[in-house]
Swiss-Prot record:
Lineage of producing organism: Eukaryota, Fungi, Dikarya, Ascomycota, Pezizomycotina
Residues carrying covalently attached carbohydrate according to the record: N177, N229
Protein name: Leucine aminopeptidase 1
Protein residues bound to Zn(2+) 2: D204, E243, H352
Disulphide bond pairs: C319-C323
Keyword Nucleotide-binding in record: no
Organism: Ajellomyces dermatitidis (strain ER-3 / ATCC MYA-2586)
Localization, UniProt: Secreted
BP terms from Gene Ontology: proteolysis
Keywords: Aminopeptidase, Disulfide bond, Glycoprotein, Hydrolase, Metal-binding, Protease, Secreted, Signal, Zinc, Zymogen
Annotated gene: LAP1
Residues that coordinate or bind Zn(2+) 1: H185, D204, D270
Signal peptide segment: 1-19
Enzyme Commission number, as recorded: 3.4.11.-
One GO CC term on file: extracellular region
Cofactor note: Binds 2 Zn(2+) ions per subunit.
Length: 385
């Protein structure tokens, strides 16, 4: 997501990393080929420029965030022309009796086990062979989660992309086509040499990936959810290529808009595991509720969910334009929100380097994000929205 303030971490180990690399064959980017290797990015509303891929990474190293909107040019899309979906969210929590026993089933051990394997791939860079392998492994875990649950109508599908690594979408049908989306991004990147250096991506965003996977597992244990009795459909998304400019999530929500899908809410979980920055600053452990470029009504409801289902409070924070995949939902007119591990300035400084490892994470903190995710998914599954 963002880039750490120091640049030396990945370089120091580069000689060792280069000596023991698995074969990483880059996969072609057909969209960029049309424009002779250049990409159209948007750094702020209306602020666009054509850049090379290396210029993209340079901007990210400088902490600049952006949409890669090259595909919009190819498809003649104009997302800002889309009408915003108007949704009225509940004024309080109505499913605590059902959610509390489910929340007790959330497992730190499951998240640790999944993340241990997920971070063992050399990189989950979206153009790499190991990025495809990690996506394949993730999809198999989701399939196992569904097959071991009572939810016979739940399903998981690939959402293919031209760059290789696919996004993954799991669907739990309800009584209507109104849909609540829970998202995280599965790719990782080492911002120094993306195609070569290791990118374990434990926090960014392996933590969000396994957090929502665990919430998904427990949600399917609900008899009402498993039998399809929820008012609304719930989807869990694991996006490819967030690090390339929100590419995977843009492709998903662009397709959803073309198909007239009725998305009522989208929550992004990107970086859920690092609490040390907050504690080192002498502040209370908390989750960070993003307040800029999000839907105000959904964000207000999420505050209630945190207060009702988490054991720690929230703090309000900002992350800027196009800072994670919720921005893609907003771009196509869908209400979205984002909850991160802390105040933005206290989030992990290890990301986008080989030092973003599982040892830096706090699984008790991730459990709080899982409780919030489960609570939101269940409450909105049965809400009149």
């Amino acid at each position: 997501m963002k880039f750490p303030s120091f640049l030396s971490l990945g370089i120091a180990a580069s000689t060792t990393a280069l000596a023991a690399l698995p074969d990483q064959k880059p996969i072609g980017d057909t969209i960029a080929d049309v424009h002779l290797g250049k990409f159209l990015i948007e750094l702020a509303p209306g602020d666009t420029r054509w850049v090379t891929e290396e210029e993209k990474w340079g901007l990210k190293r400088d902490g600049r965030k952006f949409f890669d909107i090259t595909a919009e040019v190819e498809q003649n899309l104009f997302p800002r022309a889309f009408a915003k979906t108007a949704v009225t969210f509940p004024t309080g929590l109505h499913r605590t009796v059902e959610v509390m026993p489910l929340a007790a089933q959330l497992s730190k051990d499951n998240m640790f086990s999944h993340l241990t394997t997920f971070t063992s791939f050399h990189t989950r860079y979206y153009k790499s062979e190991t990025g495809i392998q990690s996506a394949t492994w993730l999809m198999k875990q989701i399939q196992k989660t569904i097959s071991s649950s009572p939810a016979s109508n739940a399903r998981v599908e690939k959402f293919e992309h031209p760059w290789g690594q696919f996004s993954v979408i799991a669907t739990v049908p309800g009584q209507s086509n109104k849909t609540v989306v829970i998202g995280a991004h599965q790719d990782s990147i080492n911002m120094f040499l993306p195609s070569i250096l290791a990118a374990p991506g434990a926090d960014d965003d392996g933590s969000g990936t396994v957090t929502i996977l665990e919430a998904f597992r427990v949600l399917l244990q609900s008899e009402a959810i498993a039998q399809g009795n929820a008012t609304n459909t719930v989807e869990f998304h694991w996006y490819s290529a967030e690090e390339g400019g929100l590419l995977g999530s843009q492709a998903v929500f662009s397709k959803y808009k073309q198909d007239n899908k009725d998305i009522r809410a989208m929550l992004q979980q990107d970086m859920t595991g690092y609490s040390k920055g907050t504690l080192d600053a002498g502040e209370l452990e908390s989750v960070g509720v993003i307040t800029d470029f999000v839907d105000e009504g959904l964000t207000e409801f999420i505050k209630k969910v945190v207060n009702g289902y988490c054991d720690i409070p929230f703090v309000l924070t900002e992350c800027g334009y196009a800072c994670s995949d919720h921005a893609s939902a907003s771009r196509f007119g869908y209400p979205s929100a984002f909850v991160i591990e802390s105040k933005f300035e206290h989030s992990s400084q290890h990301i986008h380097t080989g030092q973003d490892t599982i040892e830096t994470l706090d699984f008790n903190h991730m459990l709080q994000h899982a409780k919030m995710t489960l609570g939101l998914a269940y409450e909105l599954a049965f809400a009149d929205i």
